[in-house]
Every structure is written in structure tokens, then in C-alpha cells.
Amino acid sequence: MRIAIIGGTGVYDPKFLENPEEIKVSTPYGEVKLLKGIYQGEEVGFLARHGAGHTVPPHRINYKANMWALKSLGVERILSTTAVGSLKLNLVPGDLVILDQFIDFTKNRDHTFYNGDDGKVIHIDFTNPYCPELRNILYETSKEIGIKAHPFGTYVCTEGPRFETPAEIKMYSFFGDVVGMTNVPEVILARELEICYASVSLVTNYAAGISPNPLTHSEVLEVMTQNIEKVRKLFAAVIPKIPKERNCICKNALKEYREKGLL
């Protein structure tokens, strides 16, 4: 299995996969349930990060188990989806954003596989947090199939599960484009495992203080439901275009440490 999709809020069923089968993977961090199926002859995995029916809040997701499970199955490429609030007036509900940067405002999450417990510590480069190769395929494909997607976006990740205050949003809007609760530490852990990771955010609402109305989770789900077909269509078109050989920074993220015998 080379490719996996991680579905966020409102994305619990890949639908385009043939013969989907639930599998369980044991990891040092806990058991993970996911689906595997076939798309155009390619075995593809699908993991619902919030669990079936959105039963796991963002701050309780077992990110390390999820990423370890995908790595153990041989996954080299991950396409993820996230529901986000917009920090900019030009990013309207229903828009897709192909993320290129993130800012981490989480507080209580385990961000690394290398905590030093076994004497191993790494300091990984994050100049390009999201796989440039996958991002380019996503954007070029979106143009080919007529789906509007913003080619860049900075994701501000908060701890959750509450929505943000207008004061927080005012601060975040100075340096971010969208705000969500799940991309960190997922993107970090993927790089530590040398997995290519790209994320498409679907704008579901304007953030607090930008929107004149109070925010509700039902509003997020409603907009996600109305627009999720765009994400499915994009991923379905992208998967056959993902090359078997990787020509990106991700596959050698730990090369320096391996060469020095530190891993």
C-alpha cells in the first residue's frame, strides 16, 4: 500500500474505493482501524482521523498510532483533508486550499517520535512542511479538472476542541490564512517517518469575529457535506498521477542522522 487518505471532519467514507475492507493495525502507541480498498488497480488506505461518526475530538486523536500504522503498511504518500475556518475574506466557504505552511498553537500534544527516551534526538528541517511534489500534483490536477483551489495557504493549528475567540482570530489573521485543529502534529510525524504528506483544506466558515454569526459544528458539517465531492473528485484524479518513484525532500528527511549512525 503506497498511498493513503486521511479524512477529517465530514469525511468518513472514501466511496470511490472498490471492495473496501476494514483492517486493524497494532502499533507501539495503540490499535488503529482503517479501510483499505482498490482504486484503478492501486491499493489505497483510508483513515478517518476522528473515527467513524466523529467520536474522537482533535486533542484526543492518537496521531502517533495513526502515522505509525500507515508507515507499517508501507505507505509513502498521504493525502489529507481538513475542515478549516477562514482568516481572510478572499477565502470563502467552499474554497479549497492546498497548504504550504503551518503555525503551531497546540499546547498538549506529542509532536515527535524522538523524545530522547532511547537516546535518539532529531531536529528535522521544516522549510517545506508539506511535500512539494504532492502539492504540485494536487494544484495542477485541480486546474485540469476545473476545480478551483488556492495553491498556497498557511494553516494555524489550535488545540481545540473549542472554537477560537475573536481576539485569537485577530492575532492569527496577521500571519495565517486558515485555522483548524488537526494538521499538527500529523504533518510533523509524517516527515519524521519520511512519508510524503499534503493537505487540502476545505473552508467551511469564516472564523469568529470575521463571521457575524456564532460558530456551530453543524454549520461546519453542512458546508463540508455540500462541498466534499470536490475533494473526492480531486483525490480520485490525483491518485493515478502519483509516481512510484519519489523525487522530493521527504524520503530523505532523516538522511543526515542515518549517515552519522544516530538512528
Swiss-Prot record:
CDD domains xref list: MTAP_SsMTAPII_like_MTIP
BP-aspect Gene Ontology terms: L-methionine salvage from methylthioadenosine; purine ribonucleoside salvage
Cited SUPFAM superfamilies: Purine and uridine phosphorylases
Highest taxon in the source lineage: Bacteria
Record EC number: 2.4.2.1
Keyword Protease in record: no
Binding site for substrate: 181, 205-207
InterPro entries for the chain: MTAP (IPR010044), Nucleoside_phosphorylase_d (IPR000845), Nucleoside_phosphorylase_sf (IPR035994), Purine_phosphorylase-2_CS (IPR018099)
Binding-site positions, phosphate: 9, 49-50, 82-83, 182
GO molecular function list: S-methyl-5-thioadenosine phosphorylase activity
Subunit-level organization: Homohexamer. Dimer of a homotrimer.
NCBIfam families, sorted: MTAP, PRK09136.1
Protein's name according to its UniProt entry: Probable 6-oxopurine nucleoside phosphorylase
Organism: Dictyoglomus turgidum (strain DSM 6724 / Z-1310)
